[in-house]
Amino acid sequence: MAAEGARRPVIIAGPCSVESREQTLATYRGLAACGCVDMIRGGVWKPRTYPSCFQGVGEVGLEWLAEAKAETGLPFGVEVANSRHVEAALGAGADMVWIGARTTGNPFSVQEVADALRGTEVLVLVKNAQMPDTGLWTGAVERMLAAGVGPERLVLVHRGFAQTSGNEYRNPPVWHVALEMRRRFPELKMLCDPSHICGRREGLAATAQKAADLSYDGLFMESHV
């Protein structure tokens, strides 16, 4: 994973959830026109707390992402939480998969995904677990490495941590936890997800700047029309 130009941060952007073909294509056309986005992202399966909440459009969303890739020339990535997701994503031509915070917190799910990725060449992003626990995050990384996902294809994503009291952030960054992961895995790139950390537009620029000041390698952001 690399951006063109010396030291330019990597930018991965796209909607939290793809909702329709029209929304997906319009979003990615806009991102491609920016000229600064390296990869497009979009969720098609959503791990919601309640079954009554939107669960994502499912595999049809992969078709829209693949179409956006074909039109814009930008590679695409999708969140996966089990082996079926991995198989469907790779079958649709995904260039990247990411493991979300809820999945990182479940070693059984992480191992299932790791086993499904064995022998593939896809880029793999691992978000921190919901709680500020370096153990769960470390364990997820170690499972990926053990499955043959080399450090050149494995990326950490810092998306903040669940809070139990009022805070200016939706998911407080607790920067020292992420920095400890960088100390443990200096060979891995790390991206910041300011969208999940902030939960709103206010604070995005400051959070992204903080990540840049800490020498993060880029941003993993939500963007949609």
Give, region by region, the residue ranges found by the protein language model.
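N-terminal amphipathic alpha-helix/helix-capping segment at the start of soluble metabolic enzymes
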Residues: 1-13
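Catalytic alpha/beta core domains of metabolic enzymes, predominantly
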Residues: 4, 109-225
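Active-site flanking residues adjacent to catalytic metal/cofactor-binding acidic residues
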Residues: 13, 78, 192
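Glycine-rich anion/phosphate-binding loops
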Residues: 16-30, 59-63, 201-206
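Catalytic domains of carbohydrate-active enzymes, especially glycoside hydrolases
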Residues: 26-44, 92
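Glycine-rich, proline-tolerant flexible connector loops at the mouths of alpha/beta enzymes
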Residues: 38-60, 224-225
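Catalytic beta/alpha-barrel core
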Residues: 41, 55-57, 73-86, 95-109, ...
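Glycine-rich phosphate-binding active-site loops on the catalytic face of alpha/beta enzymes
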Residues: 42-46, 96-107, 214-225
